[in-house]
Amino acid sequence: MSQENVERLQAVYSEWARGNFRPGGQLFAPDVAFEALTDGRAAIGRDAVEGYMREFLAQWTEFRIEAEDFVEVGETILVTERHHGTGKSSGVEAEMTVYSVWTFRDGVVVRVRWEIDRASPLEAAGLTE
């Protein structure tokens, strides 16, 4: 199942790299925990995740996420991401590397967490560098 989970995430990230953030919701469990990087708050449930993403994306004139690497350990997948965006109010272009940990259970995502530091997600996934 874990390789199938990686392939499903790769398809989602392929769309996210184009700035299309609609794909992905079908992967979430009804009570998914979505722990954002920007403000530390968590969105619980599909509707809350959708609302959070709408609010987040409204801050950008252009935003996309490219996946650079997928590391799987059981039902946990660590993704190295490259975020690109242009701020709506500032017009400033931003780019940064971010790490996400996707936890699957029975083929659906039950938790996603983002970090700036690679060590924390590696530890959460049971890996070391």
Predicted segments with their positions:
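Short beta-strand edge/turn micro-motifs at domain boundaries
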Residues: 99-123
